[in-house]
Amino acid sequence: MLVNKSSNRAWTTTDYPGIERSLFRNNDTGGRSSVVRLAKGSRFPRHAHHGCEEVVVLFGNVAIGGVDLGSGDYLFTSPGEEHDVVAVSDALIFVSSQMGTPVVE
């Protein structure tokens, strides 16, 4: 059993200002599951995944690939489907990807 309690969650800064990640797990194919914290106005550049990706917005508002999402919304991307992530407000999202994430921008 793997547990990541919010009360002792470790946050790691990313290469993108205003975006932090708390990694839950990595898998053998380069994918991972994590919670991503985004400050309003922050942006993760256009990218695609070798495998599928699933996103659940835990709170706040984001635009992923031009689709506006709010608390409780779910998004699925197919392998190779390019998208960016823009924080419309402060937000927290759960992200699970099957494989690595090459940035295309």
Region annotations inferred by a language model:
Residues 1-30:
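A short, N-terminal "cap"/entry segment at the start of jelly-roll beta-barrel domains
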Residues 64-87:
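Short acidic-glycine-tyrosine-enriched beta hairpin
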Residues 19, 79-105:
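Ligand-binding loop in jelly-roll beta-barrel domains
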Residues 29-31, 40-42, 99-101:
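Short, charged/polar surface micro-motifs in flexible loops or helix N-caps
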Residues 40, 49-64:
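Glycine- and acidic-residue-biased ligand/ion/polar-headgroup-sensing regions
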